Regions:
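Primarily a LysM-type cell-wall glycan-binding module
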Residues: 1-21, 42, 48-51
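Extracytoplasmic/periplasmic, Sec-exported soluble proteins
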Residues: 7, 15-18, 90-92, 118-119, ...
Length: 284
């Protein structure tokens, strides 16, 4: 067991990565109630291994849930990528659902460039870059089309807040270089990473694809903070689908669901948010 004093800029995921242990192990060893509420100078016990974490003293009674993250929320850039009123629906709607997407691209900027000047008003309220930067494109009180559920007249778009996470999504093995994974741009001809760079992708079979791009820790932390902030601000239930249903499209179930879901729950032809996303990192 090691001692560590938190420094400026630290997050639990960064500390865990530095010492090659799991975030859950640090949380368990230190009785941390809210992983986002750590402070500079705070002392932590760092388990040298998973066994150390399992040997740590665990309270017989589960700790209470973490306190709300607060209405101020995480840092959000509300000036860089802003849609014009003509590019979304201005009516105010009560929200009871958050829907996670990935952009199938490399940046928040590329998503914004696709949506601006688009007369059909397709967009999400937020985008999150790989480095964890969060951008608000329109106030979540309003809405835009982001689900594409046929015959619904935008019913679920109106009640939901869409979050696009910059991630290329599905990957395929290069036809001529079996040690390389490509993403879909240029007909699956754009290099992603080598197959031995295993931190950059997740091997998982889903809807005809066997590999998916990984989400960086900084991005996962930012998405979790944003989701919890929106749940607090908009009074959305802090609930995710059961594991057995996270990858399924079921309009009967998800048409009534309130909480946090993903695009794949509403469309059989969509991969997002996919098997590479770690739902536990939402800390709901």
């Amino acid at each position: 067991m090691l001692d560590y004093k938190i420094r400026a800029g630290d997050t639990l995921s960064k500390i865990a990565k530095r010492f090659n242990v799991g975030v859950d192990a640090i949380v368990q060893c230190n009785g941390i109630r809210n992983p986002d509420r750590i402070r500079v100078g705070q002392k932590l016990k760092i388990p040298a291994s998973t066994t150390d974490a399992m040997d740590a003293v665990v309270p017989s009674v589960a700790p209470p849930p973490p306190p709300p993250d607060g209405l101020d929320g995480p840092p959000i850039n509300r000036g860089k990528f802003v849609l014009l009123p003509k590019e979304y629906m201005g009516e105010v709607k009560k929200k009871d659902l958050i829907v996670l997407h990935f952009t199938a691209g490399t940046s928040a900027k590329s998503a914004f460039e696709t949506w601006k000047n688009n007369p059909v008003r397709v967009a999400t309220c937020y985008t999150v870059d790989p480095d964890g930067s969060i951008y608000e494109l329109l106030d979540p009180a309003h809405w835009a089309f982001h689900l594409g559920v046929k015959g619904s007249n935008g019913k679920h778009d109106k009640r939901s807040i869409g979050i696009e996470i910059a991630n290329v999504g599905p990957l395929k093995i290069d036809a001529n270089k079996p040690d390389q994974l490509n993403w879909w741009a240029r007909e699956w001809g754009t290099r992603w990473y080598r197959r031995d760079e295993t931190s950059k992708y997740v091997p998982a079979s889903y809807r005809g694809i066997d590999f998916f791009a990984a989400f960086p820790d900084e991005q996962l932390d930012a998405v979790g903070q944003l989701v919890r902030h929106l749940c607090e601000r908009c009074e959305i239930r802090r609930k995710v689908p059961a594991k057995a249903h996270r990858g399924k499209c079921d309009l009967t179930r998800f048409g009534k669901f309130t909480g946090v879901a993903s695009h794949q729950n509403f469309r059989k032809d969509k991969w997002d948010i996919g098997p590479a996303f770690d739902w536990d990192r939402l800390w709901l």
